[in-house]
């Protein structure tokens, strides 16, 4: 017996003797569940004193009572902490003040995050139900949308943190399994025992559930019009591609091992090869939108382009090559002079108008003047300069495109060029990624910025 297999046997024996008997676990679980049930009964008793309809909240708490009976003792103990936080927050709920209600809800969410490191399993369902009941019961119509947004954002934050934690756990699992497979690969005389141990260690569906969750998250976020959501989506794409590469690396190692063994294992190698091809195709379909941009993905594009402005974007570009995703269209410019022609009015291009000491950018008809200098900065973004004046977008609603003599226009004048599949570009700024440069429909055709998607008026041909 090899030293490695001896260590595995020792580890198995240690783990086998480290856990208490099933009977002891069962008694411990019943005791913990009873404690939670008692706490919930106490809270329901307090609710009865409120003098208002608390049916939904009681039902939510009773749902927790039933759910914990099926959970491991360790989970029940954690849920007990959450239930306690509900009881501790009742004084805030009783006031009826919407800010107190929101504060109480956030206390519960924070308790979940502290106890679980993220709302896991039973906790997230229980907490979501409790929060919903509390909001409907105590806040009524006085609950402002801004307060609700705070609570929704808190849930998003902890859900995302949970997902990131799970990805990190999957990476650790991968590292352990790939180390084991590599050790077997170095064995000169492969036996059926070696190959069967690899087959048991490497599941064909490794990481499938996690990647499926990430795919769903990416598909939702790719069309979001919320800045934070779009930014998180880019980060999740990076994690998704990392995990996908790990999975295919692992499968490739096993395929090579089976091919080396030959015989009956050739069929297993072929089956895994087909699975790997299907995996790569699914990954390619999930992320190709970044390099084949449509307007509905434009906000994600504002956080992905220019690619060399962030480590996540650089990492995504490198990893997409592994899956055969086509490179994006040109998204950087080298300081030469160009003409920016509008798609909606293709006889109009950006020019500059000076009036009373002010410099405004607008559209000029039938202009063939290639006088706009698009220069790439060290941070990856670009400046747009015309006749010594650098364009920047003002902070006003649908801000104007003004010009400054300053060499550095600041983040309002750091532009991102997002390449669309139709050959045009959408243009946003580092300062306001969700506002896109467009030509207004007035007689002057002034250059302004529009929130989210200005359609053809906000699409530009760079000539």
Swiss-Prot record:
The keyword Transmembrane applies. It is suggested that CaTX-B is synthesized in the tentacle, is modified (become CaTX-A) and then migrates to the nematocyst. Contains disulfide bonds. It is found in: Secreted; Nematocyst; Target cell membrane. GO terms for molecular function: toxin activity. It comes from the Eukaryota. Residues 1-18 form the signal peptide. Transmembrane segments: none annotated. Disulfide bonds: none annotated. CaTX-A and CaTX-B are probably encoded by the same gene. They differ by their molecular masses (43 and 45 kDa, respectively). In addition, CaTX-A is primarily localized in nematocysts, whereas CaTX-B is only detected in the tentacles without nematocyst. Has potent hemolytic activity. Is lethal to crayfish. Causes cutaneous inflammation in humans. May act as a pore-forming toxin, disrupting normal transmembrane ion concentration gradients in susceptible cells. This is Toxin CaTX-A. The lineage of its organism: Eukaryota, Metazoa, Cnidaria, Cubozoa, Carybdeida.
């Amino acid at each position: 017996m090899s030293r490695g297999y001896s260590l595995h046997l020792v580890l198995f024996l240690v783990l086998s003797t480290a856990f208490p008997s099933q009977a002891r676990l069962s008694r411990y679980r019943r005791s913990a569940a009873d404690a939670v049930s008692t706490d919930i009964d106490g809270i329901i008793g307090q609710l009865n004193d409120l003098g208002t309809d608390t049916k939904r909240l009681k039902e939510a708490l009773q749902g927790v009572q039933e759910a914990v009976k099926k959970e491991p003792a360790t989970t029940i103990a954690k849920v007990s902490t959450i239930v306690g936080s509900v009881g501790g927050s009742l004084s805030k709920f009783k006031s009826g003040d919407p800010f107190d209600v929101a504060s109480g809800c956030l206390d519960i969410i924070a308790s979940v995050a502290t106890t679980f490191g993220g709302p896991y399993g039973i906790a997230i369902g229980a907490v979501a139900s409790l929060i919903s009941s509390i909001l409907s019961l105590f806040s009524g119509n006085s609950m402002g949308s801004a307060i609700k947004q705070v609570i929704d954002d808190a849930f998003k934050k902890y859900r995302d943190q949970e997902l990131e934690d799970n990805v990190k756990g999957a990476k650790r699992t991968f590292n352990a399994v790939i180390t084991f497979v590599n050790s077997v690969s170095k064995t000169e005389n492969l036996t059926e025992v070696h190959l069967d141990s690899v087959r048991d260690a490497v599941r064909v569906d490794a990481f499938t559930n996690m990647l499926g969750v990430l795919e769903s998250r990416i598909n939702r976020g790719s069309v979001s019009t919320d800045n934070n959501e779009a930014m998180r989506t880019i980060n999740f794409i990076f994690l998704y591609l990392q995990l996908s590469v790990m999975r295919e690396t692992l499968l490739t190692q096993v395929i090579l091992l089976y091919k080396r063994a030959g015989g009956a294992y050739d069929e297993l190698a072929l089956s895994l090869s087909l699975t790997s091809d299907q995996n790569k195709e699914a990954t390619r379909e999930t992320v190709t939108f970044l390099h084949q941009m449509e307007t509905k993905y434009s906000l994600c594009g504002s956080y992905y382009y220019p690619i060399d402005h962030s480590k996540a974007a650089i990492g995504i570009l490198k990893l997409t090559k592994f899956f055969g995703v086509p490179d994006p269209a040109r998204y950087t410019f080298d300081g030469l002079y160009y003409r920016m022609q509008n798609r909606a009015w293709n006889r109009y291009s950006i020019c500059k108008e000076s009036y009373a000491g002010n410099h405004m950018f607008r559209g000029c008809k039938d202009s063939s003047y290639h006088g706009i200098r698009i220069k790439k900065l060290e941070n990856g973004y670009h400046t747009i300069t015309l006749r010594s004046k650098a364009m920047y977008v003002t902070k006003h609603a649908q801000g104007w495109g003004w010009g400054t003599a300053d060499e550095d226009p600041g983040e309002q004048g750091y532009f991102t060029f997002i390449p669309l599949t139709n050959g045009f570009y959408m243009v946003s700024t580092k300062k306001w990624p969700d506002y896109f440069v467009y030509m207004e429909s007035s007689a002057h055709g002034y250059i302004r910025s529009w929130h989210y998607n200005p359609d053809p008026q906000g699409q530009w041909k760079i000539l």
